[in-house]
Amino acid sequence: GCHELRGYGHSFSSIGLGKAIANILGTPNYFGSEARGLTWTAILQDAEERAAEFRGDVRARLQNPDRFFPKVWKRAEAVAQGELTWQEYSDEVREWEEKIPVSIRHLLDIKPRPDAKLVDPSDVDLRVGNHDMPIIISAMSYGSQGELAYRTYADAAKMLNTVCMNGEGGELLDMLGKYKQWRGQQVASGRFGVNIGFLNSADFIEIKIGQGAKPGEGGHLPGFKVTEQVAASRGTTPGVALISPSNNHDLYSIEDLAQLIDELKTANPHAKVSVKIPVVPGVGIIAVGVAKAGADIITCTGYTGGTGAARAHALRHVGLPAEIGVWLAHRSLIASGLRDDVELWVDGGMKTGRDVVKMMCLGANRVGFGTLAMVAVGCTICRGCQDGTCHVGITTHVKTKEEADRKGFKAFRPFEEKGSPHGIYNVFCAVTDDIRKWVAKLGYDNAQDIVGKADLLEQISMHDQIDLSDLTKPIPQRDGMPAQRGGLRISRPRNIISRQITEEVARYVNKGEYELTYDDEQVMAHDRALGTHLCGAIKRGEIPDNERLDAVHLSFSNSAVPGNGLGAFIDEPVTILAEGGAQDGVGKCAKGGTINILKVLNHNGARLDGSVGKSFAYGAQGGFFIVQGDADTRACIRMSGADVIFGGMIHEPLRDDLGGLGARANLKGYAFEYMTSGRALVLGDPGPWICAGMTGGTVYQRVQPE
């Protein structure tokens, strides 16, 4: 929608404004004070200098923004190749931090306490959970990355015993489950390749709310990057451009987020669920909401975190630094008594172990590296990732010099010349050694003990322009939440029926029954994600003799209207019948199977309802679905392969002059948005704004001129 200019005010923020200016602008302002920050005098001086340039009194010079990585990437690559010591690289990075500080952490130094105990760096324990280090390889997707680079990141994480997060581009089929304990799979707005097998192939599942480099924007993979292999992993059509919506269309509130987290944990009860949020104004409150929604991990991604494929305006003007995100999230979670319930991860332009220690002091449990991992396999920071002409073979699907010559590349170096898991291994091992040295200097023998100890940092430069005293204050610890009368309150799990169905099916399969019908006449709106747990158990091999299972029919009758997520992530051999209707998220990310939502007989013998809620078949890659009634907004959004029939009929001539087009249609608006493949048959009014952003698939519309 369109707003007046002031309608966008909540999206703006500032860093380092003096209090007088900040009060007038009225935006959230970080690290400014009465005594320090941008003043009217400084603004006047800047205006006078610009005026002098404009008049020609002095020579005008166009100021280029300072860029950090282009100045050090060669040194990082040399470390990966074993041609330079980490200390030499780290010292050079520190010199540039002093010359052109481009991040808040560049204004901070690590300050050991006078009474710090002596610790040998080799005695410092870096382990977090089942992994050996508090650093991870940040999410990068297949498609944006070429196959060789993409595989290399996963192999390196396994060698290092750390986590490699996957981007939103699905997974190469031969990699599914191969790196389970070292892998995180991403569920983003496009839902590319997200299905029950995908969700059960990793120990971490990340819901991507946004990206630090471009919060509020969706992704775009050009058609020339969608090869047959990329299309297979994403469940789409080769050569067709892929567009991610700007937001997840089943997430409009914290309650919706809680529902999706619940669905993912139903699909894979063994996985930890992370929620990735860009650093924006109010990030602390957002983090508290995410924790209350049931996430295990919160990832704050700063404005330098992201991709060379982001648009220039986003790279330059959008988002906030990672330091602000992790600082506010950590403090807000402590104030709410929720900090111990979640891990806090952060990424965004990290380059050294010193960066990691600073972010941990601000509140992070783990710190992500994305660009540095790319540099370790040969990236030259040319910022042409979206062009498909990467001259070092990282973000292109061209693998040989001959192929590059045929396609007119100006230069090309095959990936294998510099890229290997050993390069990343060398760099990340050097980072961990760096972390050990700094943690030992601070007097700790466990890296997690420095988490949130911001008083171990001190501001060392730009004291007049920015006030970091709030950032480096000790954080008051809260002694848990006040005790509740009657002890801890617990309630009925929303997905308990979904789990009971699995138990019943397993019991009868054990008796040699390989085709079953589970009938339930009492399901209600609070019974959510029905069929999801069963499909996950089948995929994990937890149902005995599951390869002999012919079909499992789930029948919900007697005016049943199951709760959200009916048949979410469904696959063969499961079929679902609901007589009455269903709520939001039916059949989302289905890979196969059948879902029939039918009308039900009322006491007068008339058949009524048979409708579904919002985001029906969101991201569905397969399966056959029939809806005898109507569908709420965004039916079949981002669908890529399923077959769907909507049976709701037009019963009287349409009157567009009455307004409310969506409310009076059979499909309530935005149907088939961003669809890439699949087929749909609409027997009634398809509603307004259909097929926006659609790049493939077929929609058949019944024509009724009368």
Model-derived segments and spans:
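Glycine-rich phosphate-binding active-site loops on the catalytic face of alpha/beta enzymes
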Residues: G1, L5-S11, G16, T39, ...
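Conserved, well-structured core domains of diverse proteins
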Residues: G1-A232, P421-N426, T432, R436-A440, ...
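Gly-rich Lys/Arg/Thr-decorated short loops/hinges at beta-loop-alpha junctions or inter-strand turns
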Residues: N130-I137, S233-N248, K265-H270, T304-H317, ...
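Conserved, mostly hydrophobic/aromatic
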Residues: A157, L257, V290, I298, ...
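Flexible glycine/proline-rich, aromatic-decorated loop/lid segments
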Residues: K225-A232, A295-G306, R316-A329, L362-R413
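Alpha-helix-loop-beta-strand connector modules within alpha/beta enzyme cores
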Residues: L260-A267, H317-L344
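Glycine-rich beta-to-alpha transition loops that act as phosphate-gripper elements at the mouths
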Residues: K276-G282, D341-R354
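Long, distal/terminal scaffolding or interaction modules
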Residues: Y425, R436-L442, V451-A454, K473-E706
